[in-house]
Regions:
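C-terminal extensions of enzymes
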Residues: 287-288, 294-365
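N-terminal small/glycine-rich loop or linker at the start of catalytic domains
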Residues: 5-19, 59, 79-86, 107-123, ...
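Flexible loop residues that form catalytic
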Residues: 23, 48, 153, 219, ...
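C-terminal helical cap(s) of enzyme catalytic domains, especially alpha/beta-barrels
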Residues: 52-70, 223-244, 299-330
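Active-site beta->alpha loop and helix N-cap motifs at the rims of alpha/beta catalytic domains
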Residues: 69-170
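Alpha/beta enzyme core
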Residues: 33-38, 42, 125-272, 280-296, ...
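Glycine-rich, positively charged N-terminal anion/phosphate-binding segment
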Residues: 2-8, 28-111
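Active-site mouth loops of central-metabolism enzymes
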Residues: 14-28, 88-94, 117-132, 189-197, ...
Length: 365
């Protein structure tokens, strides 16, 4: 049986399931074109908005590392260390909509077989903001974008009516989706915050209002570390810091839990998996928990010599997925997507010790 890397996700045909997430790797036409040349199946643009954006006057992203010989997390690049996580307090794109539009049109015309998903964000709570959602959506679709991702997940927005600040309000989720759906007919993905005690309820509201997919997980709210000698944070401006987003390999297990929660609650719905993918092993785990599309960020940003778009990474992901499909005799990822669902159970359903069972250990005489 011939295998294929191509997938159909939310009605869109992807040449492969691997796409770059909304982040610095997709912040410009130059980077997106380079990503498509390297082989990525799609991109989610860095979030586009209408309100003025001004980032902090200092490093916007740092990379944390750890090792076995010195088991603490630090941004210091010692020779014995490996990647642990990324931390950022970067806001959405500071490039205005009128500059994005011709770039998006050129990108799509240059790579018609690649999927361009525009990440957009506006506020909430009044008709003016609902109109802003509509304007953003219609503008990006008119220049050729294949789908829209609603950013309801950024953990450190400069406004309280945006990003993760509104993602716990199911009525706001519905109202934003209704506004956007009234303006465009392309698939709408909703990127929800993982920092929610009612994530399944939020997903239910989104799916119920017409979302084609949920994207999980964005970065987790977090703080950088303080050095015990200098008393400085590893990233700060004038000695001050604010909550930022933790991503990369450190959030993999939490991301899988949340994808699993949504997938088990809505097994017939689509999920785009994000959070800690550095290679096929991590991607595989998102697929078996129900994700039909895979977004990558930190690993691409960290790859040296790639301009932050993961040139070697996408080749490895495609090669390893193709090898796995051939080895297992699968025709596509759909043949094993979601197979872990039935094996995730309540704690009370896991077997306890008994006279004849000792948790896999030998029973002493």
């Amino acid at each position: 049986m011939a295998s294929t890397l191509s997938t159909t996700f939310t009605g869109l045909d992807f040449v492969n399931p691997f796409i770059l997430a909304s982040a610095p790797p997709t912040e410009s036409k130059r980077k997106i074109m380079k990503a498509f040349e390297a082989g990525w199946g799609g991109v989610v643009t860095k979030t586009i908005g209408l309100h003025p954006v001004e980032n902090v006057a200092g490093p916007k992203t740092i990379y944390q590392r750890t090792s076995e010989t010195k088991p603490y997390v630090s941004r210091i690049k010692r020779p014995d260390t490996v990647s642990h996580s990324s931390w950022n307090w970067e806001l959405i794109s500071d490039q205005p909509l009128d500059l994005w539009l011709p770039d998006l049109e050129e990108i799509k015309s240059s790579y018609p077989d690649r999927m361009v998903i525009a990440s957009i964000m506006a506020g909430a709570g009044n008709q003016e903001e609902m109109d802003n959602w509509k304007k953003l959506a219609k503008s990006v679709v008119d220049v050729g974008c294949d789908a829209i991702e609603l950013n309801l997940s950024c953990p450190h927005m400069d406004r309280k009516d945006m990003g993760a600040n509104v993602a716990n309000d199911e009525e706001i989720i519905r109202s934003i989706l209704q506004a956007v759906k009234s303006a465009v007919s392309v698939p709408i993905w909703v990127k929800l915050t993982p920092a929610s005690s009612s994530l399944v309820d939020g997903a239910a509201a989104a799916y119920g209002a017409g979302a084609a997919s949920i994207s999980l997980c964005n970065t987790f709210p977090s703080l950088p570390l303080m050095d015990p000698e200098t008393l400085k944070f590893e990233v700060e401006v004038d000695g001050l810091v604010t909550s930022g987003g933790l991503g990369g390999l450190a959030i993999l297990h939490q991301a899988l839990q949340r994808v699993s929660d949504i997938s088990r609650a809505f097994p017939d719905k689509s999920i785009s998996g994000i959070g800690g993918i550095r290679g096929f092993r991590e991607a595989f785990n998102f697929i078996v928990h129900g994700a039909g599309n895979l977004q990558v960020c930190t690993a691409a940003m960290e790859e040296k010599g790639s301009g932050g778009v993961g040139i070697k990474l996408i080749q490895e992901l495609k090669d390893d997925l193709r090898d796995y499909l051939d080895h297992k005799g699968h025709s596509s990822i759909e043949e094993f997507r979601g197979i872990a669902r039935e094996r995730i159970v309540e704690h009370s359903q896991v077997r306890r010790k008994s006279e004849n069972y000792n948790g896999g250990f030998a029973i002493s005489a």
